From Swiss-Prot:
Keywords: Amino-acid biosynthesis, Aromatic amino acid biosynthesis, NADP, Oxidoreductase. Involved in the biosynthesis of the chorismate, which leads to the biosynthesis of aromatic amino acids. Catalyzes the reversible NADPH linked reduction of 3-dehydroshikimate (DHSA) to yield shikimate (SA). It catalyses: shikimate + NADP(+) = 3-dehydroshikimate + NADPH + H(+). It comes from the Bacteria. PANTHER family: BIFUNCTIONAL 3-DEHYDROQUINATE DEHYDRATASE_SHIKIMATE DEHYDROGENASE, CHLOROPLASTIC, SHIKIMATE DEHYDROGENASE. Homodimer. This is Shikimate dehydrogenase (NADP(+)). Pfam families: SDH_C, Shikimate_DH, Shikimate_dh_N. NADP(+) binds at residues 136-140, 234, 257. Belongs to the shikimate dehydrogenase family. It comes from Symbiobacterium thermophilum (strain DSM 24528 / JCM 14929 / IAM 14863 / T). The lineage of its organism: Bacteria, Bacillati, Bacillota, Clostridia, Eubacteriales. The active site is at residue 76.
Length: 294
Protein backbone atom coordinates (compact mmCIF):
# COMPACT_ATOMS: atom_id res chain seq x y z
CA UNK A 1 0.00 0.00 0.00
CA UNK A 2 1.13 3.55 -0.70
CA UNK A 3 1.91 5.41 2.50
CA UNK A 4 1.54 9.18 2.47
CA UNK A 5 2.35 11.64 5.21
CA UNK A 6 -0.33 14.19 6.07
CA UNK A 7 0.56 17.81 5.42
CA UNK A 8 -1.70 19.07 8.22
CA UNK A 9 -0.04 21.71 10.45
CA UNK A 10 -0.92 23.33 13.74
CA UNK A 11 -0.12 23.33 17.46
CA UNK A 12 -2.17 20.18 17.94
CA UNK A 13 -3.82 17.59 15.76
CA UNK A 14 -7.41 16.50 16.25
CA UNK A 15 -8.76 13.17 15.05
CA UNK A 16 -11.73 11.02 15.96
CA UNK A 17 -14.24 8.37 15.05
CA UNK A 18 -17.59 8.98 13.35
CA UNK A 19 -20.39 6.53 14.02
CA UNK A 20 -23.83 6.08 15.54
CA UNK A 21 -23.66 5.11 18.34
CA UNK A 22 -20.00 5.41 19.38
CA UNK A 23 -20.20 5.85 23.16
CA UNK A 24 -18.68 2.41 23.79
CA UNK A 25 -15.94 2.65 21.17
CA UNK A 26 -12.48 1.65 22.40
CA UNK A 27 -10.82 3.69 19.64
CA UNK A 28 -10.38 6.95 21.63
CA UNK A 29 -8.62 5.18 24.51
CA UNK A 30 -6.52 3.19 22.05
CA UNK A 31 -5.31 6.14 19.98
CA UNK A 32 -4.90 8.60 22.85
CA UNK A 33 -2.71 6.11 24.72
CA UNK A 34 -0.62 5.74 21.57
CA UNK A 35 -0.27 9.53 21.22
CA UNK A 36 0.88 9.78 24.84
CA UNK A 37 3.38 6.95 24.42
CA UNK A 38 4.81 8.61 21.31
CA UNK A 39 4.94 12.08 22.86
CA UNK A 40 2.58 13.45 20.22
CA UNK A 41 0.50 16.61 20.61
CA UNK A 42 -2.74 15.08 19.31
CA UNK A 43 -6.15 14.05 20.60
CA UNK A 44 -8.78 11.59 19.39
CA UNK A 45 -12.48 11.89 20.21
CA UNK A 46 -15.73 10.04 19.58
CA UNK A 47 -18.29 11.84 17.44
CA UNK A 48 -21.83 10.44 17.49
CA UNK A 49 -23.23 11.38 14.09
CA UNK A 50 -26.76 10.31 13.09
CA UNK A 51 -27.08 9.38 9.39
CA UNK A 52 -29.07 12.55 8.70
CA UNK A 53 -26.09 14.66 9.84
CA UNK A 54 -23.30 12.77 8.06
CA UNK A 55 -22.81 15.24 5.20
CA UNK A 56 -22.53 18.14 7.66
CA UNK A 57 -20.10 16.19 9.81
CA UNK A 58 -17.84 15.56 6.83
CA UNK A 59 -17.95 19.25 5.93
CA UNK A 60 -16.97 19.93 9.54
CA UNK A 61 -13.73 17.97 9.10
CA UNK A 62 -12.69 20.53 6.49
CA UNK A 63 -14.03 23.55 8.37
CA UNK A 64 -12.36 22.64 11.67
CA UNK A 65 -9.15 21.38 10.13
CA UNK A 66 -9.26 17.90 11.63
CA UNK A 67 -6.30 15.79 10.55
CA UNK A 68 -8.56 12.82 9.88
CA UNK A 69 -11.09 10.40 11.28
CA UNK A 70 -12.04 6.77 11.44
CA UNK A 71 -15.52 5.79 10.27
CA UNK A 72 -17.62 3.01 11.75
CA UNK A 73 -21.18 1.65 11.58
CA UNK A 74 -23.44 2.82 9.99
CA UNK A 75 -21.45 5.27 7.84
CA UNK A 76 -18.72 3.23 6.11
CA UNK A 77 -20.54 3.02 2.79
CA UNK A 78 -22.56 6.25 2.81
CA UNK A 79 -19.55 8.43 3.62
CA UNK A 80 -17.96 7.71 0.24
CA UNK A 81 -20.39 10.09 -1.47
CA UNK A 82 -19.03 13.07 0.48
CA UNK A 83 -15.30 12.53 -0.08
CA UNK A 84 -13.05 14.11 -2.70
CA UNK A 85 -11.34 10.84 -3.50
CA UNK A 86 -11.47 7.18 -2.49
CA UNK A 87 -8.44 4.88 -2.66
CA UNK A 88 -8.73 1.91 -5.06
CA UNK A 89 -8.85 -0.75 -2.32
CA UNK A 90 -11.58 1.10 -0.44
CA UNK A 91 -13.53 1.47 -3.68
CA UNK A 92 -13.21 -2.27 -4.33
CA UNK A 93 -14.38 -3.03 -0.80
CA UNK A 94 -17.18 -0.50 -1.15
CA UNK A 95 -16.52 1.01 2.26
CA UNK A 96 -14.25 3.57 3.95
CA UNK A 97 -13.04 3.33 7.55
CA UNK A 98 -10.28 5.97 7.47
CA UNK A 99 -10.35 9.54 6.16
CA UNK A 100 -7.33 11.83 5.77
CA UNK A 101 -7.62 15.60 5.40
CA UNK A 102 -4.93 16.81 3.00
CA UNK A 103 -5.28 20.57 2.94
CA UNK A 104 -9.07 20.44 2.79
CA UNK A 105 -9.16 17.53 0.37
CA UNK A 106 -10.70 14.45 2.02
CA UNK A 107 -9.44 11.05 0.91
CA UNK A 108 -10.98 7.76 2.03
CA UNK A 109 -9.15 4.50 2.72
CA UNK A 110 -10.03 1.11 4.15
CA UNK A 111 -7.65 -0.55 6.62
CA UNK A 112 -10.01 -3.31 7.84
CA UNK A 113 -8.72 -6.04 5.54
CA UNK A 114 -5.12 -4.99 5.99
CA UNK A 115 -5.53 -5.08 9.78
CA UNK A 116 -7.26 -8.45 9.55
CA UNK A 117 -4.34 -10.04 7.69
CA UNK A 118 -1.78 -8.49 10.05
CA UNK A 119 -3.64 -9.86 13.07
CA UNK A 120 -3.45 -13.38 11.61
CA UNK A 121 0.22 -12.91 10.76
CA UNK A 122 0.82 -11.88 14.37
CA UNK A 123 -0.61 -15.22 15.50
CA UNK A 124 1.57 -17.11 13.04
CA UNK A 125 -1.38 -18.07 10.83
CA UNK A 126 -0.50 -18.36 7.14
CA UNK A 127 -3.51 -17.60 4.95
CA UNK A 128 -2.16 -18.72 1.57
CA UNK A 129 -3.30 -22.19 0.58
CA UNK A 130 -6.08 -22.44 3.16
CA UNK A 131 -9.75 -23.07 2.42
CA UNK A 132 -11.49 -20.01 3.84
CA UNK A 133 -15.13 -19.50 4.80
CA UNK A 134 -16.52 -16.01 5.40
CA UNK A 135 -19.76 -15.76 7.38
CA UNK A 136 -21.66 -12.65 6.30
CA UNK A 137 -21.62 -10.31 3.30
CA UNK A 138 -21.66 -6.82 4.83
CA UNK A 139 -18.92 -4.19 5.06
CA UNK A 140 -16.53 -6.20 7.24
CA UNK A 141 -17.07 -9.31 5.13
CA UNK A 142 -16.28 -7.39 1.96
CA UNK A 143 -12.92 -6.20 3.32
CA UNK A 144 -12.03 -9.61 4.72
CA UNK A 145 -13.05 -11.52 1.59
CA UNK A 146 -11.15 -9.20 -0.76
CA UNK A 147 -7.94 -9.47 1.24
CA UNK A 148 -8.28 -13.24 1.63
CA UNK A 149 -8.71 -13.55 -2.12
CA UNK A 150 -5.66 -11.38 -2.77
CA UNK A 151 -3.62 -13.28 -0.15
CA UNK A 152 -3.89 -16.56 -2.03
CA UNK A 153 -6.44 -18.73 -0.25
CA UNK A 154 -7.07 -21.99 -2.08
CA UNK A 155 -10.84 -21.73 -1.81
CA UNK A 156 -13.21 -19.00 -0.63
CA UNK A 157 -16.82 -19.62 0.34
CA UNK A 158 -19.25 -16.91 1.41
CA UNK A 159 -22.14 -18.06 3.61
CA UNK A 160 -24.88 -15.50 4.18
CA UNK A 161 -28.60 -15.44 4.96
CA UNK A 162 -29.20 -13.17 1.97
CA UNK A 163 -27.92 -15.15 -0.98
CA UNK A 164 -28.27 -12.11 -3.22
CA UNK A 165 -25.86 -10.06 -1.09
CA UNK A 166 -23.39 -12.95 -1.07
CA UNK A 167 -23.61 -13.22 -4.85
CA UNK A 168 -23.06 -9.46 -5.21
CA UNK A 169 -19.92 -9.80 -3.09
CA UNK A 170 -18.68 -12.77 -5.12
CA UNK A 171 -19.24 -10.80 -8.33
CA UNK A 172 -17.34 -7.81 -6.93
CA UNK A 173 -14.42 -10.07 -6.03
CA UNK A 174 -14.40 -11.39 -9.59
CA UNK A 175 -14.30 -7.82 -10.93
CA UNK A 176 -11.40 -7.09 -8.57
CA UNK A 177 -9.59 -10.01 -10.25
CA UNK A 178 -8.82 -11.89 -7.05
CA UNK A 179 -6.87 -15.09 -7.85
CA UNK A 180 -9.60 -17.30 -6.38
CA UNK A 181 -13.22 -17.49 -7.51
CA UNK A 182 -15.57 -17.04 -4.54
CA UNK A 183 -18.35 -19.58 -4.04
CA UNK A 184 -21.68 -18.86 -2.35
CA UNK A 185 -23.66 -21.10 0.00
CA UNK A 186 -26.83 -20.77 2.05
CA UNK A 187 -26.57 -21.32 5.83
CA UNK A 188 -27.30 -24.93 6.74
CA UNK A 189 -27.10 -26.14 3.14
CA UNK A 190 -25.09 -29.15 2.04
CA UNK A 191 -22.72 -26.78 0.23
CA UNK A 192 -22.16 -24.83 3.44
CA UNK A 193 -21.57 -27.96 5.50
CA UNK A 194 -19.09 -29.27 2.94
CA UNK A 195 -17.18 -25.98 2.90
CA UNK A 196 -17.04 -25.87 6.70
CA UNK A 197 -15.87 -29.48 6.91
CA UNK A 198 -12.86 -28.61 4.73
CA UNK A 199 -12.18 -25.13 6.13
CA UNK A 200 -8.76 -24.04 7.30
CA UNK A 201 -10.08 -20.61 8.32
CA UNK A 202 -13.57 -19.47 9.30
CA UNK A 203 -14.23 -15.75 9.80
CA UNK A 204 -17.42 -14.43 11.38
CA UNK A 205 -18.22 -11.02 9.89
CA UNK A 206 -21.79 -10.87 11.23
CA UNK A 207 -22.91 -9.22 14.50
CA UNK A 208 -24.16 -12.56 15.83
CA UNK A 209 -22.76 -13.07 19.32
CA UNK A 210 -22.26 -9.37 20.00
CA UNK A 211 -23.49 -7.88 23.27
CA UNK A 212 -26.21 -7.96 24.45
CA UNK A 213 -27.19 -11.05 22.43
CA UNK A 214 -24.18 -13.07 23.52
CA UNK A 215 -25.79 -16.50 23.15
CA UNK A 216 -26.40 -16.11 19.44
CA UNK A 217 -23.88 -17.64 17.05
CA UNK A 218 -23.38 -17.76 13.29
CA UNK A 219 -22.35 -21.42 13.49
CA UNK A 220 -24.44 -23.84 15.52
CA UNK A 221 -22.21 -26.88 14.99
CA UNK A 222 -18.54 -26.07 15.53
CA UNK A 223 -17.95 -29.82 15.49
CA UNK A 224 -18.14 -29.64 11.69
CA UNK A 225 -14.77 -27.91 11.54
CA UNK A 226 -11.54 -29.88 11.09
CA UNK A 227 -8.87 -29.90 13.80
CA UNK A 228 -6.54 -27.58 11.85
CA UNK A 229 -9.16 -24.85 11.39
CA UNK A 230 -8.59 -21.34 12.75
CA UNK A 231 -11.77 -19.56 13.92
CA UNK A 232 -11.77 -15.76 13.77
CA UNK A 233 -14.57 -13.53 15.10
CA UNK A 234 -14.60 -9.85 14.14
CA UNK A 235 -16.87 -9.19 17.14
CA UNK A 236 -14.92 -7.87 20.15
CA UNK A 237 -17.73 -7.32 22.68
CA UNK A 238 -17.52 -9.77 24.37
CA UNK A 239 -13.87 -10.65 23.80
CA UNK A 240 -14.80 -14.32 23.72
CA UNK A 241 -18.06 -14.88 21.87
CA UNK A 242 -20.04 -18.09 22.00
CA UNK A 243 -18.50 -19.04 18.64
CA UNK A 244 -14.96 -18.62 19.97
CA UNK A 245 -15.75 -20.34 23.26
CA UNK A 246 -17.12 -23.41 21.51
CA UNK A 247 -14.23 -23.43 19.03
CA UNK A 248 -11.73 -23.26 21.90
CA UNK A 249 -13.53 -26.11 23.65
CA UNK A 250 -13.05 -28.16 20.47
CA UNK A 251 -9.32 -27.44 20.58
CA UNK A 252 -9.26 -24.98 17.67
CA UNK A 253 -7.10 -21.86 17.38
CA UNK A 254 -9.24 -18.75 17.95
CA UNK A 255 -8.71 -15.04 17.26
CA UNK A 256 -11.05 -12.35 18.60
CA UNK A 257 -12.08 -9.04 17.08
CA UNK A 258 -9.81 -6.99 19.33
CA UNK A 259 -6.88 -8.06 17.15
CA UNK A 260 -8.50 -6.61 14.02
CA UNK A 261 -9.57 -3.44 15.86
CA UNK A 262 -6.02 -2.77 17.01
CA UNK A 263 -4.30 -3.54 13.73
CA UNK A 264 -6.72 -1.59 11.53
CA UNK A 265 -6.20 1.35 13.89
CA UNK A 266 -2.42 1.02 13.72
CA UNK A 267 -2.65 0.87 9.92
CA UNK A 268 -4.66 4.12 9.87
CA UNK A 269 -1.59 5.83 11.31
CA UNK A 270 0.22 5.05 8.05
CA UNK A 271 -2.11 7.49 6.29
CA UNK A 272 -2.31 10.08 9.05
CA UNK A 273 1.32 10.17 10.19
CA UNK A 274 3.33 8.13 7.70
CA UNK A 275 4.16 5.38 10.19
CA UNK A 276 2.47 2.42 11.87
CA UNK A 277 0.85 2.95 15.25
CA UNK A 278 2.37 1.25 18.34
CA UNK A 279 0.41 -2.01 18.35
CA UNK A 280 1.30 -3.17 21.87
CA UNK A 281 0.33 0.15 23.46
CA UNK A 282 -2.90 0.29 21.47
CA UNK A 283 -3.83 -3.28 22.38
CA UNK A 284 -3.27 -2.71 26.10
CA UNK A 285 -5.35 0.48 26.09
CA UNK A 286 -8.18 -1.02 24.02
CA UNK A 287 -8.33 -4.08 26.27
CA UNK A 288 -8.45 -1.92 29.39
CA UNK A 289 -11.23 0.20 27.88
CA UNK A 290 -13.30 -2.84 26.93
CA UNK A 291 -12.82 -4.56 30.28
CA UNK A 292 -13.81 -1.37 32.07
CA UNK A 293 -17.12 -1.06 30.22
CA UNK A 294 -20.32 -2.21 31.93
Amino acid sequence: MTKRRSTSRGPGRILGILGHPVAHSASPAMHNAAFAAQGMHAMYGAFDVPPSQLEKAIAGIRALGLLGVNVTIPHKEAVMAYLDDVAPTARQVGAVNTIVNRGGRLIGYNTDGWGFLLSLEERGVRVAGRNAVVLGAGGAARAVALHLGMAGVARLTIINRSRQRAEFLAADLARAKTPVRAEVADPGSEEARAALAEAGLVVNCTPLGMEPDTESTPLEDVGLLPAHCVVYDTVYRPLETRLLREARQHGLITVNGLAMLVHQGACAWEYWFGRRGPVDVMRTAALAALEGQP
